[in-house]
C-alpha cells in the first residue's frame, strides 16, 4: 500500500471521499 504525501512532505493517510460529489456536475446549470 502506498502512502500519499501532502504538500508539506509528510506521509498522509488517505482520506475517504464520497464519490457522489463527483457526479454532481450533471445538471449543466451554474449558480452564481
From Swiss-Prot:
It is found in: Nucleus; Chromosome. Testis. GO terms for biological process: cell differentiation; chromosome condensation; spermatogenesis. Signal peptide: none annotated. Keywords: Chromosome, Developmental protein, Differentiation, DNA condensation, DNA-binding, Nucleosome core, Nucleus, Spermatogenesis. One of its GO terms (molecular function) is DNA binding. Residues 1-32 are annotated as: Disordered. GO terms for cellular component: nucleosome; nucleus. Protamines substitute for histones in the chromatin of sperm during the haploid phase of spermatogenesis. They compact sperm DNA into a highly condensed, stable and inactive complex. The heterogeneity indicates the existence of other protamines. This is Protamine-1.
